[in-house]
Curated annotation (Swiss-Prot):
Keywords, ordered alphabetically: Cytoplasm
HAMAP family, sorted: CutC
Name of the molecule in the record: PF03932 family protein CutC
Domain of life: Bacteria
Gene3D superfamilies: Copper homeostasis (CutC) domain
Recorded family membership: Belongs to the CutC family.
Main subcellular location: cytoplasm
Amino acid sequence: MALLEICCYSMECALTAQQNGADRIELCAAPKEGGLTPSLGVLRTVRQHVAIAVHPIIRPRGGDFCYTDGEFAAMLEDVRTVRELGFPGLVTGVLDVDGNVDLARMEKIMAAAGPLAVTFHRAFDMCANPFNALKNLADLGVARVLTSGQKSDAVHGLPIIMELIAQGDAPIIMAGAGVRSENLQRFLDAGVQEVHSSAGAWQASPMRYRNHGLSMSTDAQADEYSRYAVDGAAVAEMKGVIVRHQAN
């Protein structure tokens, strides 16, 4: 049966995903940045309270995936922390200035991760040549690749996703970006074995008092009275699609 991974930004979201049928969680912070490394406090509390597999993301900032020496040193420390806390896997990715997998740095990450299953995230979609990148990641021993098929969403990238799957059994190709219950069947019919979804939406803050005269963000237009949350019903609906597909 296909595996359902849900992207979560808090312990509450992780518990919601677990209760509604998620098989695995990608744990992140900062949804507006596309997902950054969670704090140590979040890592510890999720590790204590969530029973299903949780793979934290290792990403020190938003933007591109070509990191300074200082940023990369911090990434290695975060990898070691995730390993020490007992997580079964992690999610990360590093590119060089030419849009290739940074082999030297990824080798260091793989060594620091040890037995943990490593997912190469959507830095893959920013690679100059996805097929060369896939071969490099296979040689490194990366467990899976999260990809939208180098398109803005995985529906439009499905032809490339299918080509990547046809390259071999490893790494596993996990489709993500815009995957929802209403289009999930297309991925299952195409032979995708793992799917990734945020399965959520922005929700209004419970704050009653709101000072609209200033912003804590460098983006003055940012809505600071909203937060991203996993929708349990959406997770359950996606799981139902997978179960029904397996039964047919």
